């Protein structure tokens, strides 16, 4: 058990190394390593995750998955069930914590500063461009989650769907 936890601690700098060297490690490799770490977390936390409707995902090109947001595991759960590399747009303030930073960096996630409209517009443009190039993204249109929301969908933020609309890309609804 101690050796297993030491290995997991070693994964954090390893994830950082992989994310700093995208020229050496492909997007697919980094995504699979992210999924490997998610599997270890699932085992430790005794979490089971099931995905349904994957046959309905677009076969080619980029698309944006829009999901309700219930908690910290949501993006990881979607990535666990999604075979093709995808990325995520996340609140900058929450994206620099231990392990979260490494997960976001590995998938080249976008950090959105909620209170900075100019930066947010730039992120929307980046996501639009990358979706046009074939990347897949996870966006939580409610902008976050509240522990008190009682499993209700929060209101969507204005502009949440702009990147998919501007890219003329499929919008994939995801329910958690």
Residue ranges and their predicted role:
Residues 48-176:
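Soluble catalytic domains of membrane acyltransferases
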């Amino acid at each position: 058990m101690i050796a297993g936890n030491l290995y997991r601690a070693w994964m954090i700098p390893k994830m950082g190394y992989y994310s700093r060297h995208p020229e050496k490690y492909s997007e697919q490799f980094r995504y699979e390593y992210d999924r490997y770490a998610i599997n270890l977390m699932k085992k430790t936390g005794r979490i089971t995750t099931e995905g349904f409707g994957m046959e309905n995902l677009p076969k080619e090109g980029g698309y944006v998955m829009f999901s309700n947001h219930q908690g910290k595991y949501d993006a990881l759960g979607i990535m666990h069930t999604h075979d093709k590399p995808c990325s995520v747009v996340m609140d900058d303030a929450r994206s620099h914590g231990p392990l979260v930073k490494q997960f976001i960096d590995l998938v080249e996630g976008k950090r959105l500063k909620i209170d900075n409209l100019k930066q947010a517009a730039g992120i929307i443009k980046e996501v639009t461009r990358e979706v046009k190039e074939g990347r897949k993204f996870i966006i939580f249109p409610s902008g976050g989650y509240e522990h008190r929301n009682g499993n209700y969908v929060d209101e969507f933020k204005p502009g949440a769907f702009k990147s998919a609309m501007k890219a003329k890309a499929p919008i994939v609804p995801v329910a958690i």
